[in-house]
């Protein structure tokens, strides 16, 4: 008898469940979560036999930048680890193109578990885009929580009104050094993942279709997409497990 028959079926099920986005490492973790222990070498072998492979990572897109300036210090200093929720947030804006039209995504990520806690989609990168995103994020704070919010030096974050919104809300502003994308590497990495696992895989006819897919993907990313760093749990699963 084929000793890997049920394991092979599970690998295939997980692969299709996640629309081909998982490579052998995440499939191994997902199998473990279902009580099936396989090493990476075995998972790769089974995937090869099944003729499946993870979708290729496409090179990282450079996010939308404004004029360079000097507004505040880099308080994060590439320390992307947070010991509790709502301690360190990061944000940025990225751009998508569909048939000559543009769509902008502005999210806030919590570095505690990599969860996208708030985001806004807009066809123009206006101040209201980041304001709406910030307002939604603030609703999740208890009165004692005062996160650092880190960004690059994009024009949105240099606006005096953005600084005022943060100050009035008790949020501590932090900014990357000039021209240094590694200072905000985690949110840049999220954009790369989103684009390679969603945007680049489809040919969109209009902005509305893309918008719908991004909303679906962010929900998937938060609720279902497991991470080795989080012990094989998704961001939301990890947060709930730590709070229990």
What label would you give each PLM region?
Residues 2, 65-67, 151-153, 159-162, ...:
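RNase H-like two-metal-ion nuclease catalytic core shared by retroviral integrases
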Residues 1-84, 180, 236-242:
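Basic, flexible linker segments flanking DNA-binding modules
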Residues 120-143:
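Active-site beta-loop-alpha junctions of metal-dependent nucleic acid enzymes
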Residues 11, 27, 43, 47, ...:
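Mobile genetic element proteins and their domesticated derivatives, centered on retroelements
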Residues 113-119, 173-176, 200-201:
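Short small-residue beta-strand/loop micro-motif enriched in glycine and branched aliphatics
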Residues 78, 82-117, 123-127:
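An active-site-proximal beta-strand-loop segment
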Residues 3, 7, 23, 39, ...:
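Hydrophobic (often cysteine-bearing) scaffold residues that line and stabilize catalytic clefts
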Residues 167-171, 193-244:
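C-terminal domain-tail junction helix/linker
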């Amino acid at each position: 008898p084929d000793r890997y028959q049920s394991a092979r079926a599970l690998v295939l099920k997980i692969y299709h469940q996640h629309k081909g986005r998982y490579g052998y490492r995440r499939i191994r973790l997902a199998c473990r979560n279902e009580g099936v222990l396989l090493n990476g070498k075995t998972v790769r072998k089974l995937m090869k036999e099944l003729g499946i492979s993870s979708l290729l990572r496409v090179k990282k897109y450079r996010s939308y930048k404004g004029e360079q300036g000097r507004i505040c210090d880099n308080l994060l200093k590439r320390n992307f680890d947070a010991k509790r929720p709502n301690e360190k947030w990061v944000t940025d804006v990225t751009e998508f193109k569909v048939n000559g039209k543009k769509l902008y995504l502005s999210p806030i990520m919590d570095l505690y578990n990599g969860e996208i806690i708030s985001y806004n989609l807009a066809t123009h990168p206006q101040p209201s885009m980041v304001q709406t995103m910030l307002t939604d994020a603030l609703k999740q704070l208890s009165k004692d929580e005062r996160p650092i919010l880190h960004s690059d030096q994009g024009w949105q974050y240099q606006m005096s009104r953005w600084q005022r919104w943060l100050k009035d809300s008790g949020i501590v502003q932090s900014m990357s050094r000039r021209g240094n994308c590694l200072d905000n590497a985690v949110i840049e990495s999220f954009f790369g993942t989103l684009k390679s696992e969603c945007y680049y895989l489809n040919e969109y006819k209009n902005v509305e279709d893309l918008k719908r897919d991004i909303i679906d993907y962010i929900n998937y990313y938060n609720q279902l997409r497991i991470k080795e760093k989080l012990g094989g749990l998704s961001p939301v699963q990890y947060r709930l497990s730590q709070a229990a």
